[in-house]
Amino acid sequence: MMPNIICLKAVISGKVQGVGYRYSTRAKAQSLGLVGWVRNLPDGRVEAMAEGERTQVDKLIEWFKQGPPAAEVSKVDVDEESLGEFRAFEILR
């Protein structure tokens, strides 16, 4: 049986910049075997694209709601995307 591969884009709001959110997201995504990227947005939010097995992506989405210890997440918006061509999980600048 083929694994259920999905790609989701998440936009995380709250106190999520300057608290190590991107670095923690990359570490968490890598530990879950996911590929994609994470970046800061000019308006103070963080945006992430994650692709992999549905169960693992769901775990990352749940983690987004908490984030690293210094983060204060107020909202996580998630949209399903078409599969990308990611080879790793990167921090975009």
Swiss-Prot record:
Active-site feature positions: 22, 40
Residue intervals of the Acylphosphatase-like domain: 7-93
UniProt KW keywords: Hydrolase
InterPro entries assigned to the protein according to its UniProt record, in alphabetical order: Acylphosphatase, Acylphosphatase-like_dom, Acylphosphatase-like_dom_sf, Acylphosphatase_CS
Catalytic activity, as annotated: an acyl phosphate + H2O = a carboxylate + phosphate + H(+)
Top-tier EC class: hydrolase
EC number per UniProt: 3.6.1.7
Domain of life: Bacteria
Originating gene: acyP
Recorded family membership: Belongs to the acylphosphatase family.
Organism this protein belongs to: Acaryochloris marina (strain MBIC 11017)
Protein name as it appears in the record: Acylphosphatase
GO molecular function, one term: acylphosphatase activity
